[in-house]
Amino acid sequence: MRTLWIVAVCLIGVEGSLLEFGKMILEETGKLAIPSYSSYGCYCGWGGKGTPKDATDRCCFVHDCCYGNLPDCNPKSDRYKYKRVNGAIVCEKGTSCENRICECDKAAAICFRQNLNTYSKKYMLYPDFLCKGELRC
């Protein structure tokens, strides 16, 4: 399922906050969100279940939980704006949903940077069937 989503994103482009999130990831880590984080471990990419494979995957787990706390928002499509001030990500004022989505994405991008040393290519394109259990935030 995740692979299908990745192909769809590549074919139709990325809209909404996914575009901003990808930009944040690149700025913080020097890595392109696709393919580096689009299907990494059990939580990076669409959906998630099981135990995070490493600290990088845990960043995605926390990010999924953050989005889960925004039931009235559309994190994949609602656009927000941010800027950098002295190298730091600053979410610009928007709607309540835009602000909260931006803060979730900001935390994940920073988490990825802080855990670059745990990033392992063996978890890129990680198969879903190896991830067992439910998401428990």
Swiss-Prot record:
Residues annotated as binding Ca(2+):
Y43, G45, G47, D64
- Cofactor, how bound (note): Binds 1 Ca(2+) ion.
A biological process from GO: phospholipid metabolic process
Q: Which cysteines are joined by disulfide bonds?
A: C42-C131, C44-C60, C59-C111, C65-C137, C66-C104, C73-C97, C91-C102
Taxonomic superkingdom: Eukaryota
Q: Where is the active site?
A: H63, D105
EC number, as in UniProt: 3.1.1.4
Q: In which tissues is it expressed?
A: Expressed by the venom gland.
| GO annotation, cellular component aspect | extracellular region
Query: What does it catalyze?
Result: a 1,2-diacyl-sn-glycero-3-phosphocholine + H2O = a 1-acyl-sn-glycero-3-phosphocholine + a fatty acid + H(+)
Which keywords, in A-to-Z order, does the entry hold? Disulfide bond, Hydrolase, Lipid degradation, Lipid metabolism, Metal-binding, Neurotoxin, Secreted, Signal, Toxin
InterPro entries membership: PLipase_A2 (IPR001211), PLipase_A2_Asp_AS (IPR033112), PLipase_A2_dom (IPR016090), PLipase_A2_dom_sf (IPR036444), PLipase_A2_His_AS (IPR033113)
> What is its EC class?
hydrolase
Q: Which GO terms describe its molecular function?
A: calcium ion binding; calcium-dependent phospholipase A2 activity; phospholipid binding; toxin activity
Q: What CDD domains does the record point to? A: PLA2c (cd00125)
Q: Where in the cell is it found?
A: Secreted
Q: Residue span of the signal peptide, if any?
A: 1-16
- Required cofactor names: Ca(2+)
Describe the task this protein carries out. Answer: Snake venom phospholipase A2 (PLA2) that is neurotoxic. PLA2 catalyzes the calcium-dependent hydrolysis of the 2-acyl groups in 3-sn-phosphoglycerides.
The record's comment on protein family reads:
Belongs to the phospholipase A2 family. Group II subfamily. D49 sub-subfamily.
Name under which the protein is recorded: Basic phospholipase A2 DsM-S1
Output the lineage of the source organism: Eukaryota, Metazoa, Chordata, Craniata, Vertebrata
